[in-house]
């Protein structure tokens, strides 16, 4: 191995001495070649045919006879140092001119869920067109009244988000300020925070603050009363106690309802006469002393109002009064029936109450305790 290394070293020294003249001419500093402004990977522009020879000399492309394997290996290692200028030039070109990377569209799952993933925002600024599956952010409206507006997209790829006061982002959204107001190089200087998602389901909802006696004065009262029970109007309080329990009514509610009085419905004739004739009771079988005069007065008034011939009715009423006072009960009944039959048919109802009330005990129990339907209809 040592002998082989010595042979290789001597051969390289000989070749180096021969190629010193050509290498000095090629390693001199030359003017940079004019590059085009395109986005091609190896964009050397449009050059003349004479310049391709210069590029070939710079790149170290030389026609050499094929030698042994060791010589070709050593030559390729030496040419790698000469081609460092081209690789550095290409590296500077890629850094100075940032070409937009063509990123792939999101997966089908992201399109269906209509979600703005964090990985997609960090990778690229690819924005799809409006379609049925994917809806753009500016067309989506929040139901609570807050609108989402899409800001200017920076070269870093993060959108500047603005929201209305009714639906705001969490408190740490201030980290997005370098991306909206600064240059892209200033934005990359800080550690980038992941952009907040634009939908309510992904946002972190801050828990409510613990209630204190200052904020809720009812807590102090409840603590003093050793904890008040919940209201009975809420059905979830005593659900465990209500299984199989029937509602019991208080004992006072079982009161006897008023029943129908059948005795009043089957009244006798004496009760009917006691109700229809004032001043006359069923137990008392005699008329009071003033009742005939009162009944005669009512009959006279009815006759004066209803009849057209006043003198005829006055004579009839006077004759009836004389007959009633003079005769007994039997003769009075016969005269009353005769006078009723002698009158016209339209005047039968005039002195009806007088005849009814003038009857004595024989007439009271004449029907045997049954109601006279014809007399009820006449009344």
UniProtKB/Swiss-Prot annotation:
<dbReference type="GO" id="GO:0005634">
    <property type="term" value="C:nucleus"/>
</dbReference>
<comment type="similarity">
    <text>Belongs to the FAM53 family.</text>
</comment>
<keyword id="KW-0879">Wnt signaling pathway</keyword>
<protein>
    <recommendedName>
        <fullName>Protein FAM53B</fullName>
    </recommendedName>
</protein>
<dbReference type="GO" id="GO:0090263">
    <property type="term" value="P:positive regulation of canonical Wnt signaling pathway"/>
</dbReference>
<feature type="region of interest" description="Disordered">
    <location>
        <begin position="302"/>
        <end position="348"/>
    </location>
</feature>
<dbReference type="GO" id="GO:0048675">
    <property type="term" value="P:axon extension"/>
</dbReference>
<feature type="short sequence motif" description="Nuclear localization signal">
    <location>
        <begin position="246"/>
        <end position="249"/>
    </location>
</feature>
<dbReference type="GO" id="GO:0031101">
    <property type="term" value="P:fin regeneration"/>
</dbReference>
<feature type="compositionally biased region" description="Polar residues">
    <location>
        <begin position="326"/>
        <end position="342"/>
    </location>
</feature>
<feature type="compositionally biased region" description="Basic residues">
    <location>
        <begin position="239"/>
        <end position="249"/>
    </location>
</feature>
<dbReference type="GO" id="GO:0016055">
    <property type="term" value="P:Wnt signaling pathway"/>
</dbReference>
<keyword id="KW-0539">Nucleus</keyword>
<dbReference type="GO" id="GO:0006606">
    <property type="term" value="P:protein import into nucleus"/>
</dbReference>
<comment type="function">
    <text>Acts as a regulator of Wnt signaling pathway by regulating beta-catenin (ctnnb1) nuclear localization. Required for appendage regeneration by regulating cell proliferation.</text>
</comment>
<dbReference type="InterPro" id="IPR029356">
    <property type="entry name" value="FAM53"/>
</dbReference>
<dbReference type="Pfam" id="PF15242">
    <property type="entry name" value="FAM53"/>
</dbReference>
<comment type="subunit">
    <text>Interacts with ctnnb1.</text>
</comment>
<feature type="compositionally biased region" description="Polar residues">
    <location>
        <begin position="212"/>
        <end position="236"/>
    </location>
</feature>
<feature type="region of interest" description="Disordered">
    <location>
        <begin position="206"/>
        <end position="257"/>
    </location>
</feature>
């Amino acid at each position: 191995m040592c002998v082989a290394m010595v042979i290789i070293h001597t051969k390289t020294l000989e070749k180096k001495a021969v190629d010193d003249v050509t290498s000095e001419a090629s390693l001199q500093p030359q003017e940079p070649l004019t590059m085009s402004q395109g986005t091609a990977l190896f964009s050397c522009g449009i050059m003349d045919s004479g310049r391709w020879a210069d590029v070939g000399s710079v790149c170290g492309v030389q026609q050499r006879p094929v030698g042994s394997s060791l010589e070709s290996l050593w030559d390729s290692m030496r040419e790698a140092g000469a081609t460092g200028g081209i690789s550095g030039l290409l590296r500077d070109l890629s850094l100075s001119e940032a070409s937009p990377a063509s990123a792939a569209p999101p997966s089908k799952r992201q399109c269906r869920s209509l979600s703005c993933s964090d990985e997609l925002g960090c990778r690229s600024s690819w924005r799809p067109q409006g379609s049925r599956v994917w809806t753009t952010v500016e067309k989506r409206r929040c139901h609570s009244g807050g609108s989402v507006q899409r800001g200017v997209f920076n070269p870093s790829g993060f959108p500047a988000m603005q929201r209305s006061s009714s639906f705001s982002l969490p408190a740490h959204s201030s980290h997005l300020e370098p991306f909206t107001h600064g240059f892209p190089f200033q934005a990359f200087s800080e550690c980038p925070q992941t952009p907040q998602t634009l939908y309510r389901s992904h946002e972190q909802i801050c828990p409510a603050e613990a209630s204190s006696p200052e904020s809720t004065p009812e807590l102090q009262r409840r603590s003093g009363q050793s904890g008040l029970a919940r209201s009975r109007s809420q059905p979830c309080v005593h659900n465990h106690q209500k299984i199989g329990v029937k509602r019991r009514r208080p004992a006072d509610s079982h009161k006897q309802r008023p029943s129908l009085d059948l005795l009043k419905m089957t009244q006798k004739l004496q009760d009917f006469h006691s109700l229809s004739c004032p001043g006359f009771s069923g137990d008392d079988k005699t008329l009071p002393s003033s009742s005939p005069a009162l009944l005669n007065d009512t009959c006279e008034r009815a006759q004066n109002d209803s009849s057209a011939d006043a003198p005829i009715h006055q004579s009839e009423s006077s004759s009836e009064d004389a007959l009633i006072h003079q005769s007994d009960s039997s003769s009075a009944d016969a005269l009353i029936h005769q006078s009723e039959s002698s009158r016209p048919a339209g005047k039968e109802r005039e002195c009806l109450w007088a005849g009814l009330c003038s009857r004595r005990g024989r007439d009271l129990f004449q029907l045997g305790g049954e109601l006279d339907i014809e007399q009820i209809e006449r009344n």
